[in-house]
């Protein structure tokens, strides 16, 4: 039985040098259809352009530009071969394709139960408070408030889901799949364990659905938040203004003041650091106000040299089966131990 487990966990899916470009080709074809043309995803083509226009500006003001002028230097700055051909990136690509199929089932589950129930809760809270109702169409001001309120509620719930993922040992074993990335590209966004993502999705959608139900009671004719390409305008703006640099090697800080409101790519780099001083920091998705309020914010004063990962042996997370099956094995071992604290790795 142990031999079979080793064979399964160490099964490698096309990460040898000769196969890398085959994997990339398959991924690219699927990716173009599934993500790049879909306006509701962070990996929509406009968001890529927004991020890498910013990256190009960063390059032009960097020392590298003045020492290595030319388009090849710019391309190597934005898309370094050692990162984009890294085993970790190849695993990101494979996981992204697999997860895209699993996500359809996951969202079917949460749309049937938690989201509908949360919407009803918000509706009945408003009714209990005896708030006034109007049959008039909501004004642009109401729609703007609704748009921001649903986003804030979703982000607040995301903050706590993310914090819990780093706090509870069993959940952390599943969240490790994302944090075990040794290098990061925008595709690392899709490197997650399906069970981890399902719980996150429930938290996020419950928050926004309760808020939506609350507004629906007061404005029965409200049709939804203000959107661009079916995406909340707040999210769309955040995505197009460089959010894809969060999972990258390119450092972008928002400065000491704006960073108290929004999570910058640099702050998310800190979150992915294996350095102990960076552990349990910057849990927010879009807004950093939650980290600020609850004492988990870390705003770097200047660029810091960061090693991405979780500080555990890389071979524990170097194959796709290990990233999917490993969390169940480790979680099961936690339940079997009488004293888990002595052996549970501290989440970064």
What are these regions (language model features)?
Residues 38, 85, 226-230:
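Membrane-water interface of alpha-helical transmembrane segments
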Residues 21, 25-29, 116-121, 125, ...:
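Alpha-helical hydrophobic membrane-insertion segments
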Residues 42-127, 146-154, 158:
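Specific transmembrane helices
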Residues 1-45, 68-69, 74-76, 338-348:
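Transit-peptide-like, low-complexity N-terminal presequences
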Residues 229, 301-348:
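A membrane-cytosol interface segment of integral membrane proteins
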Residues 98-110, 122-124, 132-306:
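Membrane-embedded catalytic scaffold of the fatty acid hydroxylase/desaturase
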Residues 2, 6-10, 19-30, 34, ...:
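Short hydrophobic helices that act as membrane-entry/anchoring signals
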């Amino acid at each position: 039985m142990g031999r079979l487990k080793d064979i399964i966990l160490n099964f490698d899916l096309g990460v040898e040098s000769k196969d890398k470009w085959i994997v990339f080709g398959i991924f690219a074809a699927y990716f173009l259809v599934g993500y790049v043309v879909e306006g509701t995803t962070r990996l929509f083509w406009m968001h890529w352009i927004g991020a890498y226009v910013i990256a190009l500006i960063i390059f032009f003001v960097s020392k590298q530009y003045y020492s290595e002028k030319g388009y090849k230097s710019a391309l190597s700055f934005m898309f370094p071969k050692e990162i984009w051909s890294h085993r970790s990136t190849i695993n990101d690509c494979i996981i992204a394709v697999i997860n895209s199929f699993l996500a359809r089932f996951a969202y079917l589950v949460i749309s049937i139960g938690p989201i509908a129930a949360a919407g009803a809760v918000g509706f009945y809270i408003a009714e209990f408070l005896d708030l006034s109702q109007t049959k008039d169409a909501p004004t642009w001001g109401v729609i703007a408030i609704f748009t921001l309120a649903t986003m804030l509620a979703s982000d607040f719930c995301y903050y706590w889901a993310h914090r819990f993922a780093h706090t509870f040992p069993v959940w952390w074993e599943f969240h490790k799949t994302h944090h075990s990335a040794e290098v990061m590209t925008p595709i690392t966004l899709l490197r997650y364990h399906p069970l981890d993502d399902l719980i996150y999705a429930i938290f996020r959608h419950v928050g926004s659905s309760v808020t939506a139900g609350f507004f629906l009671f007061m404005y029965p004719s409200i049709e939804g938040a203000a959107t661009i390409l079916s995406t909340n305008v707040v999210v769309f703006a955040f995505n197009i203004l460089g959010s894809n640099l969060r999972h990258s090697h390119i450092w972008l800080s928002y400065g000491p003041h704006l960073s108290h409101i929004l999570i910058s790519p640099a702050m998310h780099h800190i979150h992915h650091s294996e350095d102990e001083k960076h552990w349990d920091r910057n849990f927010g998705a879009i807004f950093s106000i939650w980290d600020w309020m609850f004492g988990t914010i870390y705003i770097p004063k200047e660029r810091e040299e960061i090693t991405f990962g979780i500080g555990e042996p890389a071979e524990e997370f170097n194959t796709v089966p290990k990233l999917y099956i490993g969390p169940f094995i480790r979680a099961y071992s936690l339940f079997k131990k009488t004293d888990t604290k002595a052996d549970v790795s501290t989440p970064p």
